[in-house]
Swiss-Prot record:
This protein binds to 23S rRNA in the presence of protein L20. Keywords: Ribonucleoprotein, Ribosomal protein, RNA-binding, rRNA-binding. It holds the Pfam family Ribosomal_L21p. It comes from the Bacteria. Belongs to the bacterial ribosomal protein bL21 family. SUPFAM superfamilies: L21p-like (SSF141091). GO terms for cellular component: cytoplasm; ribonucleoprotein complex; ribosome. It comes from Teredinibacter turnerae (strain ATCC 39867 / T7901). One of its GO terms (biological process) is translation. PANTHER family: 50S RIBOSOMAL PROTEIN L21, LARGE RIBOSOMAL SUBUNIT PROTEIN BL21M. The keyword Ribonucleoprotein applies. This is Large ribosomal subunit protein bL21. InterPro entries: bL21-like, bL21-like_sf, Ribosomal_bL21, Ribosomal_bL21_CS.
Length: 103
């Protein structure tokens, strides 16, 4: 069984037992989180598509860890002007393990 959920402004295809990196969620490590915005639920040839969400469907997950992604370096450069600006960014993420799909 699989599902498509909306979390953190993105859509993710998930299956039970899968570990997934999402945008940061303010939930402590080890706690469970429920995703109610389930856009699609499928099991073999049986597929339920929501308009926009599937009624009564829910995906539960356990928070595994929080962290920061690899650094992305931004460089702004103006030619012939001796001007260069460097900046780095590391995005926070939450790693969750999908424990159940209902619907």
């Amino acid at each position: 069984m699989y599902a498509v959920i909306a979390a953190g402004g993105k859509q993710h295809r998930v299956e039970e037992g899968e570990v997934l990196r999402l945008e940061k969620i303010e939930v402590a490590t080890g706690e469970t989180v429920d995703f109610d915005q389930v856009l699609l639920v499928g099991s073999g040839a049986d597929v339920k598509i929501g308009t926009p969400v599937v009624e009564g469907a829910k995906v539960t997950a356990e928070v595994v860890s929080h962290g920061r992604a690899d650094k992305v370096t931004i460089i702004k450069f103006k030619r012939r002007k001796h001007h260069m600006k460097r900046q780095g960014h590391r995005q926070w993420y939450t790693e969750v393990k999908i424990t159940g799909i209902q619907g």
